[in-house]
């Protein structure tokens, strides 16, 4: 069974692209050419979003190695939304993309195990165990310590899956907790980075990185640099590029001499490229997927140039 981070890195190397497209759809983000085709009820809205997701996946599947699906944008539509989530995961896997579920799960004991069963492991159904969602990685909250992370790590080992543990997030208020000083003068985020590096020792793959990986925001370059210095075997999922203001030259600090070390998420700037100042005059609304593809190529080139020239 191949190590999950090796699968991800193999895809990144194959496409020469350290990018993941976030699929965080809301109805207002959809072009009218899709919205007008469906009823304005829960079922119709979810059908419209699924068409949108499919078109975006088809547009980028040969140039972007992975998608990050934020489950909150599906849960808010209830049962129809969870079917949409499952269908989107399946469609992405059918098109040979690595699937990262952004759910930020965190609890202890049997609850953590239940979360892990759903996304990484298998659920007992009578005398058999069955896979529920076909995904590769899950984001995890470490605030309750190893008790809240170990069930996920155990399933990573057994089923060849991976996790991204929150270390330093890209939101403006993240420093209220994550940058606090603790005993010895360290920031909390530094201590968590050291823990994640330790937790992942048994899951390091052929490239030297572990399937116990980390979420590190693009919007805090000094923190990103500090975390890399203490978490040398930890792969980074890096949100905050594009709409949140993260710059390629800052993100490049996460990458090693082989151009590895991170995968950079963009959600709004890719999904809604057809509305952006850069592309709105070049593409009609019906060509939204083409605009996403062009933005994906621009982002790839921007990141690769920064990584090579750092």
Regions found by a protein language model. Give the residues of each.
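Active-site-adjacent beta->alpha loops and helix N-cap segments on the catalytic face
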Residues: 76-91, 108-114, 144-157, 219-227, ...
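Conserved N-terminal beta1-alpha1 strand-loop-helix module at the mouth
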Residues: 1-69, 74-87, 91-96, 100, ...
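Active-site-proximal loop/turn and secondary-structure-junction residues that shape catalytic pockets
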Residues: 25-27, 71-75, 105-107, 142-144, ...
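A C-terminal functional module that forms or caps the active site or interfaces directly
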Residues: 218-265, 269-276
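Conserved anion-binding
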Residues: 107-212
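C-terminal helical cap(s) of enzyme catalytic domains, especially alpha/beta-barrels
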Residues: 251-257, 272-310
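Conserved, mostly hydrophobic/aromatic
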Residues: 21, 67, 102, 138, ...
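Glycine-enriched alpha-helix->loop->beta-strand junction motifs that scaffold or abut catalytic
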Residues: 64, 134-136, 157-163, 208, ...
């Amino acid at each position: 069974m191949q190590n999950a981070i090796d699968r991800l890195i193999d895809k990144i190397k194959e496409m020469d692209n350290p990018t993941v497209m976030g699929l965080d759809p809301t109805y207002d983000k959809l072009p009218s050419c899709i919205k007008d085709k469906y009823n304005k009820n829960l079922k119709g809205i979810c059908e419209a979003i699924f068409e949108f997701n499919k078109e975006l996946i088809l547009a980028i599947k040969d140039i972007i190695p992975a998608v990050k699906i934020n489950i909150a944008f599906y849960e808010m539509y209830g049962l129809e939304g969870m079917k949409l989530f499952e269908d989107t995961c399946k469609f992405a896997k059918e098109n040979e993309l690595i699937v990262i579920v952004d759910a930020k799960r965190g609890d202890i004991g049997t609850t953590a195990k239940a979360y892990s069963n759903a996304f990484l492991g298998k659920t007992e159904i009578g005398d058999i165990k069955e896979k529920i969602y076909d995904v590769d990685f899950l984001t995890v909250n470490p605030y309750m310590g190893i008790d809240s992370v170990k069930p996920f790590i155990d399933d990573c080992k057994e089923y060849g899956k991976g996790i991204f543990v929150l270390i330093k997030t890209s939101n403006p208020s993240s420093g209220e907790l994550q940058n606090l000083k603790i005993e010895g003068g360290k920031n909390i985020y530094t201590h968590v980075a050291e823990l994640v590096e330790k937790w992942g020792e048994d899951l390091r793959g052929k490239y030297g990185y572990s399937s116990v990986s980390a979420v590190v925001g693009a919007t805090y370059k000094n923190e990103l640099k500090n975390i890399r210095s203490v978490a040398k075997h930890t792969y980074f999922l890096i949100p905050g590029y594009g709409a949140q203001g993260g710059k390629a030259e800052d993100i490049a600090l996460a990458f090693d001499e082989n151009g590895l070390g991170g995968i950079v998420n963009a959600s709004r700037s890719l999904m809604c490229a057809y509305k952006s100042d850069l592309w709105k005059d070049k593409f009609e609304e019906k060509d939204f997927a083409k605009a996403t593809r062009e933005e994906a190529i621009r982002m790839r080139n921007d990141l690769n140039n920064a990584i090579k020239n750092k």
